[in-house]
Amino acid sequence: MISFEGIPAIYFNSLFGKSNDEAKYIITGNNRDVNRYKWNYKNISKKLSNKNSKQSIFFEKISNLLSIRRKQKAFHPNASRHNINLGSKIFSFKRTSINKKQTVICITNLSSKIQRAKLNKIYHNWTNLIGSKIEIKNKLLILKPFETIWLSTK
């Protein structure tokens, strides 16, 4: 969702990998309470200072994605987006900068199994902005389970 057009909206609790607060929902019966967990400042500060905690890892990863997004002209809030059909288990679209100088192809494997996608263009010379080198075998892009890549022209 961070790669969609517009300004990313992220629930505060998502920054820390907080699961739904089902206990609060059961007590109140209010659907919105499921994602309204109230953090104690001291508690979250302690968790963030531990680089191995789930909260610290989530915060670091999401902060990194937002930092990468901020530097890409193709992720300008008004840059265009066009869907790309790579199959029912792969969600993909293309973002193009307003000045047409940068294109980013966002591809996500929605399944728990390896997926292969045939790309019409040669993307192996492009840069994956958010991960390691992309894997291409027999002209097919290989995506690990739940993997997301952002392929950029620059």
Regions found by a protein language model. Give the residues of each.
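Residues immediately flanking
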Residues: 109-110, 153
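Short, exposed beta-strand/loop patches in secreted or surface proteins that constitute
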Residues: 81-84, 133-136, 141
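Surface-exposed beta-strand/loop patches in extracellular or lumenal glycoproteins
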Residues: 110-124
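C-terminal beta-strand-rich structural cap/linker in extracellular carbohydrate-active enzymes
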Residues: 137-154
